[in-house]
Amino acid sequence: MKGTVLDQILSDKNLNVAYQRVYQNQGMPGVDKMTVFALKGYLQRNGEKLKNLIRQQQFKPQPVLRIERSKGKGDVRLLGIPTAVDRLVQQAIYQVISPMFEKQFHDHSYGYRPNKSCEMAVMTSLEILNDGYVWVVDIDLETFFDLINHDKLMGIVSRTIKETAVATLIKKYLVSGVTIKGRFHQTTRGVAQVPIKSVIK
């Protein structure tokens, strides 16, 4: 795949793969109530317009729909549901930039990474225990994603992503806001947890 990073993101091949992934994952509709089943028709009618808006940096992501899901024992977990269009764009971004960041991650980082799994994390832990290490640190990252500093995150992103248009698009997703019980809330920090892999893992 040649061209700029943005060209790669908006290539027909990349967008088609992104569409297939979003369609397979399905999931709930976002704030606009568009299902993934309606996405194909929407893209047939508006695909070129969508690409042009992104190229001209005029595309505006919709707020993420926040819903509560029971974790059992009275605990609830807040989930973020982007619109089908935003899931498509996020997936298209992810497919292109993920390999750029993948080589920077620690080999024993297993969350949301290609060719990594929970089972591999357990096996590595057992190997470490068998090597004689006996201390285990259990860290709960429950609120981590809600507290991420946008400027620091974008500083890290910009070390690898040099194109202003792509960095700006990612930043727009960070500040697109959330809708909770019909009310819009600005997002000045944090990253909404989405049902697809996060753009920056």
Predicted regions and their residues:
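Short, Φ-rich (hydrophobic/aromatic) sequence segments
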Residues: N46-K51, V89-I93, I97, I170
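Conserved polymerase palm-domain catalytic core
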Residues: L53-I54, K60-I67, G72, D107-H108, ...
